A protein has these predicted regions:
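Short, non-helical or kinked segments that cap or interrupt transmembrane helices
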Residues: 108-112, 130-143, 181-188, 366-374, ...
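Hydrophobic, membrane-embedded alpha-helices of multi-pass small-molecule transporters
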Residues: 64-80, 224-235, 250, 265-266, ...
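Transmembrane helix-bundle signature of multi-pass membrane transporters/permeases
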Residues: 115, 119-123, 145, 161-164, ...
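Membrane-embedded alpha-helical modules
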Residues: 150-270, 392-518
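Membrane-embedded helical hairpins/re-entrant loop segments and their flanking transmembrane helices
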Residues: 19, 23-24, 43-67, 83-125, ...
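Intrinsically disordered, low-complexity non-transmembrane regions of multi-pass membrane transporters
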Residues: 1-68, 267, 271-299, 333-341, ...
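Extracellular loop-to-transmembrane helix junctions
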Residues: 96-126, 143-171, 398
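Alpha-helical transmembrane segments and their cytosolic membrane-interface
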Residues: 41-89, 102-107, 172-210, 356-363, ...
């Protein structure tokens, strides 16, 4: 009997190796449970890498694809793109006297990001050409830094080009895992805690200011301030419940929708105006980057813009690796055995993110790209591979960009701020705390947080990495195992490059009066 069972299993494995997906596919009715059917689908898929993958022949659409595509992916990315563009608008308006960008600009740029990049990099790239590359989405940990990036004199296009080039080099030389090993858990934890805490405080302040500032002909200013407290209080309870029941991947849509409903129910509806017209946004790159009077109002990037963008591009790429590896590990934890062929390829994903970063921004966008976590995590939980949901998601995102009016709701403070709180900043804060497991980690984390407050997170990360890798703080046993290049050359080089770039463009002038060299 045992021999018969092993023969059957060996034959199944042999069939999976030799037969095509179409030959191996069996209808769901032949399986005892839906979960077994989905497991079998993952085990028999053979995605073609940079070849044409077709529905029916190489993969199928299932109801479960709607979970990552509709619930988490689409709603999540509308909130994130809107938040990124609002951060750019606020930061650039503050940084430059001639620039005045507002909500209309943010919505228009978000719609640009939701059209061609969604078509090229969701539908075509991850759907049809390489289903092993996860979708290129939004780099959550960089959102709290966008204001600082703008104030530092950086240029979105310069940042995108540097980020794209560094990302391509990293994926070509397979350097992602090297960067992960260079930054200790204490240093990474401190960085995430600082970004999570400062971001959380800024979102809470924004909701409070919005609620207190509500006024109309019938409503006195300050009389509706309690709405902010109710929105925040209810969302904290919901977030805690979702965490308890392992449904945190639903946090963005549930909490954003809750914020919308509460604000409307308590009478703040007069503040929500649907002004965005149906149609296409301006898709001419010359409009966005061609002059200082329209679009981004920055013109083409200069050498100074590239130098100002350099430290942030280095940090963004360094933060890619743990993000990408985390998404792949999450897939491995949720998928059955023998599904290696459908797991996301970290280097392919990095290549796609790098190209998408440059293409999306060149077309007029301002997103900072990374592996799309709000897509991958629910997809892994739903036991679905990348392509089916990617195609549905890309089509949904493009539809909303053309409709226009959902974007007005997405940038309304009780919606956008709640989405950022539960989708970016609280998870960053929690992830940072989980990384600090002992006194050695807390030393590095403390120095990183202190350095971030004194100067900025980029310089603090580089300095803490140098101190930590040389055993001056943190785990001395870990430091003893590192080579001279890992201890001194790479961390020291990153620190010197970042410091020179910051001093050259006067990034520390407003804080410490250090004049720009250029």
């Amino acid at each position: 009997m045992r021999n018969h069972m092993s023969d059957v299993m060996n034959k199944e494995r042999s069939d999976i190796e030799t037969k095509s997906y179409r030959e191996l596919h069996r209808p769901a009715s032949e399986f005892a449970t839906r979960s077994e059917y989905l497991d079998h689908e993952l085990q028999i898929m053979k995605p073609r890498r940079f070849g044409l993958n077709l529905p029916g022949r190489d993969f199928r659409f299932e109801l479960e694809d709607l979970v990552p595509a509709l619930v988490a992916g689409t709603i999540g990315i509308i909130s994130m793109y809107s938040a990124v563009m609002m951060s750019w608008a606020d930061g650039l308006t503050q940084a430059w006297d001639h620039i005045n960008l507002g909500k209309e600009f943010a919505i228009e740029v978000a719609r640009v990001e939701m059209l061609f990049p969604a078509l090229f990099f969701c539908v075509i790239a991850s759907g049809f050409l390489n289903p092993r590359a996860n979708l290129a989405g939004n780099h959550g940990p960089m959102i709290p830094l966008i204001g600082s990036i703008a104030l530092a004199g950086a240029h979105p296009l310069a940042l995108a080009i540097l980020l794209g080039v560094f990302g391509l080099l990293l994926s070509y030389f397979k350097g992602g895992s090297k960067l992960v090993n260079l930054t200790s858990e204490g240093t990474a934890g401190g960085l995430l805690i600082f970004l999570g805490f400062t971001g959380t405080m800024s979102q809470i302040t924004s909701i409070q200011e919005w609620a207190v500032g509500l006024q109309s002909a019938d409503v006195a200013a300050g009389s509706m301030g309690y709405i902010g407290l109710v929105v925040l209080g209810v969302n904290i309870v919901i977030y805690a419940l979702l965490a308890k029941f392992n449904l945190r991947w639903l946090a963005i849509p549930v909490c954003a929708f809750t914020g919308l409903v509460i604000a409307l129910a308590l009478g703040a509806g007069f503040d929500l105006k649907f002004e965005t017209q149906m149609g296409l946004p301006n898709l001419n790159p010359v409009y966005w980057w061609g002059s200082t009077e329209q679009g981004w109002m920055l013109g083409m990037p200069t050498l100074q813009h590239f130098i100002a963008s350099l430290p942030f591009a280095i940090l963004a790429v360094a933060m890619w690796s743990p993000d990408f590896l985390g998404h792949r590990i999450f897939q491995e934890l949720n998928y059955p055995k023998r599904t290696e062929k459908v797991l996301m390829d970290v280097d392919d994903t990095m290549t796609m993110c790098s190209i998408r970063q440059m293409v999306g921004t060149a077309l007029g966008g301002g997103n900072i790209t990374s592996s799309w976590g709000t897509y991958m995590i629910p997809a892994a939980i739903a036991k679905r591979p990348i392509p089916g949901g990617a195609i549905i998601l890309g089509c949904l995102v493009m539809t909303i960009a053309i409709l226009g009016f959902p974007m007005d709701a997405a940038v309304w403070p009780p919606v956008m701020r709640c989405a950022l709180l539960v989708g970016v900043f609280l998870p960053l804060l929690e992830a940072g705390m989980q990384m600090i497991k002992n006194t050695k980690d807390s030393q590095a984390a403390g120095i990183c947080i202190f350095g971030s407050a004194v100067v900025n997170p980029v310089l603090a990360w580089a300095l803490t990495m140098l101190l930590d890798n040389n055993g001056l703080i943190g785990d001395k046993e870990r430091a003893a195992k590192l080579s001279f290049i890992d201890k001194v050359v790479i961390p020291g080089g990153v620190l010197i490059i970042c410091l020179i770039a910051m001093l050259a463009v006067g990034m520390l002038e407003s804080q410490y009066g250090l004049q720009a060299w250029l």
